[in-house]
Amino acid sequence: MEGYRLKEYSCFTSAGACFILSVVYVASLYVWNSPHNRDHPSTIKKRFFSVFIMMFVSPLFLYYFSQEHILQKATLWQLLGLRLHGLLPAIVIPMFLTMVLFLGPLSMQGFSGLWKLYAGIKNVWISGVNIFNIIFEAEPMYWMSNLTNLIWLRNHVVAPLSEEFTFRACMLPLLLQCFRPMTAVFVCPLFFGVAHFHHMVERMRNGLDFKRALMISCFQFSYTTLFGAYSAFLFAKTD
């Protein structure tokens, strides 16, 4: 595949590749001529297929626009962050750091007992005394119902995985070969945030006026960009 790689390279090329990849990712969601909204099962299934294809297309951008000396030092899998060496700390440390950031909601769910719904723990009481817990007995249908819920799968599985893979794993290595690490960390999420403006079209179709739809989209851009910077920082530090 060496003959299909870009020979000349610049920072503009890196940023341009990320921009094009963002456009292609969003465009893949709208290639289907569907009269239904984004939450309709047929629309969700079609978009699942689109992002599945993008999981194969996105690494091609990374390979084609990567500098030759970088690919000589690391494989494409390693650039994507998929490697065995250091994988465990790369998973555990960011997970605990993220848990610290969400310590408030986690504490509230812990005190209220709501976490038992997710863990499937049932208290067994005898004469008013909690004797022991039974695992996976409280609400077994909670996870089963969610795994068959297309909207839940989209919001919690498919969208996060495909977005992180495309906007982090495939874009950040391109920017890191040109920009300083911290610069790349803050530039990369801009593509991620801007990509969410396509939801503005859906909101206007649902009857929301332009000004209101724009305000909501700008707010969404703010928090998705902020989260994207945090995610990009974790990726850069654990790569």
Spans of model-derived segments:
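Specific transmembrane helices
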Residues: 1-160, 173-177, 236
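Transmembrane helix-loop-helix hairpins at the membrane interface
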Residues: 26, 145, 149-239
